[in-house]
């Protein structure tokens, strides 16, 4: 997983509240068996509207999504995070997130930063006044900056550490590879084991 310390990218103002995971990625796209390639599925229902924000040229290369209250609510689907990540988003700013979405985001390298609604309103205005404006998200200092405006954001300490270190669940496990190898070497042979996969024909 790519490390995250400071990111600067085009901000995308999404003036919508209660955006659930089915709106982020419709269920029809969940049939895929891969973990990547979901960029076309992101907000698929809304992207049929020519006026949707991601259909506006200045916002298309966006990597910082600025959303309304209760982003990522609804069913638990990691695909919602994958779709945002595959499109190119590194951070989502919102006053509040769905708990499961927020947890999934941190494990997949996407920062879900909690920003006060009053600050979100000011960021929306700045991005709409000058489409294509870049937003700086500083995870080390926990601040977001747009032009001369700076606002703090909240993120769980553990999630912040994982993002800064670039550690997904596999990366965390591999940090203990030596201990795992040592344990397996000392483990009694009469205990159950898993059978290695047979080579494919």
From Swiss-Prot:
Key words of the record: Amino-acid biosynthesis, Branched-chain amino acid biosynthesis, Leucine biosynthesis, Lyase
Uppermost EC category: lyase
Pathway: Amino-acid biosynthesis; L-leucine biosynthesis; L-leucine from 3-methyl-2-oxobutanoate: step 2/4
Pfam families: Aconitase_C
Enzyme Commission number, as recorded: 4.2.1.33
Signal peptide residues on this chain, from the entry's feature table: none
UniProt xrefs under InterPro entries: 3-IsopropMal_deHydase_ssu, Aconitase/3IPM_dehydase_swvl, AconitaseA/IPMdHydase_ssu_swvl, IPMI_Swivel, LeuD
The UniProt record lists the keyword Lyase: yes
Keyword check for Transit peptide: no
GO molecular function: 3-isopropylmalate dehydratase activity
Gene3D superfamilies xrefs: Aconitase, domain 4
Catalytic reactions of this protein: (2R,3S)-3-isopropylmalate = (2S)-2-isopropylmalate
Family under the similarity heading: Belongs to the LeuD family. LeuD type 1 subfamily.
Reported function: Catalyzes the isomerization between 2-isopropylmalate and 3-isopropylmalate, via the formation of 2-isopropylmaleate.
Subunit structure: Heterodimer of LeuC and LeuD.
PANTHER family: 3-ISOPROPYLMALATE DEHYDRATASE SMALL SUBUNIT, 3-ISOPROPYLMALATE DEHYDRATASE SMALL SUBUNIT 2-RELATED-RELATED
Record protein name field: 3-isopropylmalate dehydratase small subunit
Lineage, uppermost ranks: Bacteria, Bacillati, Actinomycetota, Actinomycetes, Kineosporiales
């Amino acid at each position: 997983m790519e490390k995250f310390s400071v990111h600067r990218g085009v901000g995308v103002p999404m003036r919508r509240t209660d955006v659930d995971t089915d709106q982020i990625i419709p269920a029809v796209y969940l049939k895929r068996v891969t973990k990547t390639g979901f960029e076309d599925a992101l907000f698929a229902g809304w992207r049929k509207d020519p006026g949707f924000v991601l259909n506006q040229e200045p916002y298309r290369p966006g990597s910082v999504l600025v959303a309304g209250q209760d982003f990522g609510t609804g069913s638990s689907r990691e695909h919602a995070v994958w779709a945002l990540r595959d499109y190119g988003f590194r951070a989502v700013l919102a006053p509040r997130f769905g708990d499961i979405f927020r947890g999934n985001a941190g494990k997949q390298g996407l920062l879900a930063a909690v920003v006060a609604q009053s600050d979100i309103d000011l960021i929306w205005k700045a991005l709409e006044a000058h489409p294509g404006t870049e937003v700086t998200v500083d995870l080390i200092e926990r601040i977001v900056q747009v032009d001369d405006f700076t606002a703090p954001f909240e993120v769980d300490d553990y999630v912040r550490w994982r993002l800064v270190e670039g550690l997904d669940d596999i990366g965390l496990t591999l940090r203990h590879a030596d201990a795992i190898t040592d344990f397996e070497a000392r483990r009694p042979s009469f205990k159950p084991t898993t059978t290695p996969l047979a080579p494919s024909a």
